[in-house]
Amino acid sequence: MSTQSVSSHNIESSSFSANQHAAEPSVATGGIISEIVYNADQPIVTHLLLPLLQQLGTQSRWLLWLSPQQRLSRPWVQQSGLPLDKMVQLHHINPLFTVDAMERALLTGNYSAVLCWLPHELTEEEKVRLRHAAQAGNTYGFIMRPESAGDDAYRLFPSLKIHSTLYH
């Protein structure tokens, strides 16, 4: 894995094991899934999420970006202060299998955070699967979903769902 570029990575061929991270201190225990519904014209989400990702980047584990539609910009990653040598991106995946890929990644325990861009809401069954996988892998999972016209009927304002065991 080169420290000079954002790397592609095969989830199933990772050489790390979940047990390597058991003794490592973590930001949260048990893993968690949060959904961020965003408006592409409002960069506030970036400002909210970056400090957490920077903190998670100090762990020995990877940061995984599942973004089927686009690639991460290397200059943006460098400018944002995220560790290039711990960034992994999968962008050549079928959008239909993105949730399955996220579940497998969360289960491995190899990632501090898994960010996943989805064009639609998750089913209840998918939410349960991801929640269990995040807890099993002690991993943060962020589901990034763009605001759609249908969301306007239910929301007066853009929303951010932040779930934390620190506040409950």
UniProtKB/Swiss-Prot annotation:
Question: Region (FtsZ binding): which ranges?
Answer: 105-111
Where are the residues of the annotated region Lon protease binding?
161-168
InterPro entries assigned to the protein according to its UniProt record, in alphabetical order: Cell_div_suppressor_SulA, P-loop_NTPase, SulA_CellDiv_inhibitor, SulA_enterobact
Matching entries from Gene3D superfamilies are given as: P-loop containing nucleotide triphosphate hydrolases
Record's keyword terms, sorted: Cell cycle, Cell division, DNA damage, Septation, SOS response
**Sites marked Essential for degradation by Lon protease:** H168
PTM summary from the entry reads:
Is rapidly cleaved and degraded by the Lon protease once DNA damage is repaired.
**Which residues does UniProt assign to the signal peptide?**
none
Question: GO biological process: what's one of them?
Answer: division septum assembly
Q: Where are the transmembrane segments?
A: none
What SUPFAM superfamilies does the database record attribute to this sequence?
P-loop containing nucleoside triphosphate hydrolases
Which Pfam families does this chain map to?
SulA
Could you tell me what induces this protein? By DNA damage, as part of the SOS response.
Region feature (Disordered): 1-20
Functional note: Component of the SOS system and an inhibitor of cell division. Accumulation of SulA causes rapid cessation of cell division and the appearance of long, non-septate filaments. In the presence of GTP, binds a polymerization-competent form of FtsZ in a 1:1 ratio, thus inhibiting FtsZ polymerization and therefore preventing it from participating in the assembly of the Z ring. This mechanism prevents the premature segregation of damaged DNA to daughter cells during cell division.
Q: Which HAMAP family match?
A: SulA
Family that this chain belongs to: Belongs to the SulA family.
What interactions and quaternary structure are annotated? Interacts with FtsZ.
Q: What is this protein called?
A: Cell division inhibitor SulA
Q: Which organism is it from?
A: Pectobacterium atrosepticum (strain SCRI 1043 / ATCC BAA-672)
